[in-house]
Amino acid sequence: MSQPRPLLSPPETEEQLLAQAQQLSGYTLGELAALAGLVTPENLKRDKGWIGVLLEIWLGASAGSKPEQDFAALGVELKTIPVDSLGRPLETTFVCVAPLTGNSGVTWETSHVRHKLKRVLWIPVEGERSIPLAQRRVGSPLLWTPNEEEDRQLREDWEELMDMIVLGQVERITARHGEYLQIRPKAANAKALTEAIGARGERILTLPRGFYLKKNFTSALLARHFLIQ
């Protein structure tokens, strides 16, 4: 069997994207890095986004850190998800930065969260720390669109969390708010502050926040599609 090659330009169809992702299934991260001419870091402590970058190179992703989807022409977002030996997610999944100001008139339908999650290519990757990074294998891809129930679950959490932001309660939001979607600080250091609305409607400075999918949401999603027991 011939070795796969990274896509040199963005895929033109979902079928091409999925076919390329399926070719990567079963390869280790070290093998894919070597085939792409990259060096595999010893661990992810200083290279937290390395796996995502590696797979973006292989799949011809275009967006980088821009607000549009990774495959903007297809409207598809790429999400790598570290899983244990039973295929269960090991951590929450970052969706996008949470807007803390300028939220008047924003609805779920027009929200950045929904835009990012309306079509997702999930790629599970072995994530147990006992497995050296280079030896972790890539799993089978899943091209997913939220069904009605999933959309409702996410919408209810998003509305609850956005209400708290708009009402000046951002500092009261904890990771326990939201059943499937949570907001928590997203900053490499505590000095990176951003503007938000305070309890009396005044401008305050606070840590940037991000939206994350909780493990119970992604676990059910993967289990349903891969029939994990």
UniProtKB/Swiss-Prot annotation:
Any one GO CC term of the record: cytoplasm
Location relative to the cell: Cytoplasm
UniProt-listed Gene3D superfamilies: DNA mismatch repair MutH/Restriction endonuclease, type II
Record's keyword annotation contains Nuclease: yes
Keywords recorded for this protein, A-Z: Cytoplasm, DNA damage, DNA repair, Endonuclease, Hydrolase, Nuclease
GO molecular function terms attached to this record: DNA binding; endonuclease activity
Protein's GO biological process: DNA modification; mismatch repair
Transmembrane segments: none
Chief place of localization: cytoplasm
Matching Pfam families: MutH
Superkingdom, taxonomy of origin: Bacteria
CDD domains listed in its UniProt record: MutH-like
Family per record: Belongs to the MutH family.
HAMAP family listed in its UniProt record: MutH
Primary role: Sequence-specific endonuclease that cleaves unmethylated GATC sequences. It is involved in DNA mismatch repair.
Protein name (Swiss-Prot/TrEMBL): DNA mismatch repair protein MutH
Organism: Shigella boydii serotype 18 (strain CDC 3083-94 / BS512)
